[in-house]
Every structure is written in C-alpha cells, then in structure tokens.
Amino acid sequence: MFFFPKLRKLIGSTVIDHDTKNSSGKEEIMSNSRLALVIINHAFDKVLSLTWHCGILSEIRSGLMLMFGIFQLMCSLGVIVLLLPIIILDAIDLFLYMCRLLDYGCKLFHYNRSSLPVADGKEKTSGPISGKEEIVIDEEIINMLNESSESLINHTTAGLEYDISSGSVNKSRRLNSTSTVTFVKQNKLVNERREDAYYEEEDDDFLSNPNYDKISLIEKSFTSRFEVACEQKAA
C-alpha cells in the first residue's frame, strides 16, 4: 500500500530532473511524456483507492462476521438457558420412573418368592389368601346377611295381627295406631298344607313407625359387621 506513493514520487523526480537537463529538447516529446506520467499517476491513484476500499471492505466483512458469530453464540446460550430447566425436570422424572420401576420389580420378585410352596411343612408367613379361606369368609358374610335380613323383617312386621274374619291386618296396641294392610297370600305346599307368605303395608308411613329406631340400629349394626367382614376378607 505504501509502495505506490514512493514509486510515483520517484517517477516525478526523474521527470523533473530530465526536464532541467534537456531544456532545449523537443516540446512534443516532453508534453507526451508528461501526459503519460499524469496518466500513470492517475492509474496509481485508482489502484491505491481500489486497494484501500478493498481493505476497508475486508475489514467490514471481518467485523460483520465477528458480530454475527457473537450474536449466534448469544442465541445459542439463550436457547440453552431456556431449555435447561425443562431438561433438568425431564431428567428428574426419568430418574423417579426408574426408581419406581425398580421398586415394582423388587415387590414382584418378593411376591413371587412368597407365593412359592414352602418345603418341610413350614407355614407361609405372607402371601395371598387361599381359596378355601375366601370361601369361608364369603359364607360368613352370606350368613350375616341372612340373619340381619331376618331380624329386620321380624322387627318391621312386629305388632301386626291378622284378622281371619275380615282378611286384613291390624296393628297391635304397641304401635298405638291402626291402618289397613293388604294381606298377600302365596300358596305354598309345605308338608301338604298351605301357608301364608308375607304382609305388605300400604297406608302407613315408614318414618311414623315407632320401630324405625330399632330398624335403623339394626341397619347400622349390620353395616358395621359387614364392613368388618369385608376388612377381614381383604386382610
């Protein structure tokens, strides 16, 4: 870049020296030589400006590339910072799922070992309830249901008297009220004789029955016993 100005000064000084030595020379040759030197000087100026502008362009290009690299790096860091919590949460969830899977595998292995038959007549301390025990518990629940239903029917029908002549049922003095009750007959042959099946009330409100407290107590006791039996079955 500094070579062209020095060359231009050297050419100009030689031309001036030549003009002073040959002052009596031909003017056409001198004018042509001067014109050539001026053209060369302008060419050098253009080359210098071109190289200068190319250098500026290269510097601008390198600066823009540096700025673009910094911007790209900042964008990458921003994306990493934004995605880092999600990545950490996914890693924690994956770790918890793996721990849960290992826990389930250990439980399954322990269950399979406990369900295997034990030799030398040793009883198992843990394991599922056998089918025989389940059947026994089911029978207990069924018997409890039958007993509670029979006691409930006996309390609800307590105090009802059947009048043979009128074919209706009246309440006794314990209920302190009388109401018409339809007596439904079902003919069943039991030991070659007819028996009457059940009563059905029509005009009586269930809540006005004095035996309602007894019935509710029976239901509560039945519910509690049924829950206890179900807990024993599930244990």
Swiss-Prot record:
Ranges that cross the membrane: 68-88
Keywords carried by this UniProt record: Lipid droplet, Membrane, Phosphoprotein, Transmembrane, Transmembrane helix
Phosphoserine found at: S177
Major site of localization recorded for this protein: other
Gene Ontology CC annotations of this record: lipid droplet; membrane
GO BP of this protein: lipid catabolic process
Subcellular compartments: Lipid droplet; Membrane
Coiled coil residues, start to end: none
Disulfide cysteine pairs (residue numbers): none
Membrane topology: Single-pass membrane protein
Other observations noted: Present with 922 molecules/cell in log phase SD medium. Open reading frame exhibits genomic organization compatible with a translational readthrough-dependent mode of expression.
Name of the protein this chain belongs to: Bypass of stop codon protein 2
Annotated organism of origin: Saccharomyces cerevisiae (strain ATCC 204508 / S288c)
Gene that this sequence comes from: BSC2
